[in-house]
């Protein structure tokens, strides 16, 4: 247990023991009731079939059902704030590893750790507008990660036929039981190793636009507005 955890009260530690387990069970139940369809699954599979790994990028708004996409070994970037500890534990119960940090807090150390786990043979999953926004604005960290690893960034999203939209900064989406969920993979984006500041910004904006496009495309399946 790290020093920060030692400062938690016994009540907080009890909640940390209970909530992630309960959350993962509820989420698994929800996923079992939902009918899922994946569009363009060949986009990541083309890399996986060649033994290559990818960086999957999805909006914070749409992260809830991402654990139920067909994945191989994947590590998820999760923020270092207090809520992130609960999320990291829940992700572990769902069978995934986590890297702690974000595009702001702990960014450099998280970047180094993501490079390390990628080179050991893992996909990386990130929410490039998380953990605090602005909504649907890509931060530069994911682009820098792609430059340093040579991995393609593949945007991915989902939409649901029936869902609850929360009033949070990201308008977080909770698909309702027995709804339909459509996942959609976007086209890969490569960032040259020698990319300078201007090229990195160009890549950031291109990724942001592709993520916007696939989100709109997924929402059109159920005629929703993101």
What do the predicted segments below correspond to?
Residues 28-53, 59-62:
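A short, well-structured juxtamembrane/interface segment
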Residues 38-40, 58, 78, 187, ...:
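Pocket-edge structural micro-motifs
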Residues 50-105, 149:
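Catalytic core of membrane glycerolipid acyltransferases/transacylases, capturing the structured
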Residues 44-45, 88, 142-143:
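Short amphipathic alpha-helical segments and helix-helix/interface helices
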Residues 31-36, 53-54, 101-105, 131-132:
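Short, flexible loop segments at the rims of nucleotide/cofactor-binding pockets, characterized by
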Residues 38, 78, 100, 155, ...:
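Structural signal for conserved beta-strand scaffold positions within catalytic alpha/beta enzyme cores
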Residues 2-25, 48, 71-72, 93, ...:
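Non-catalytic C-terminal accessory region of glycerolipid acyltransferases
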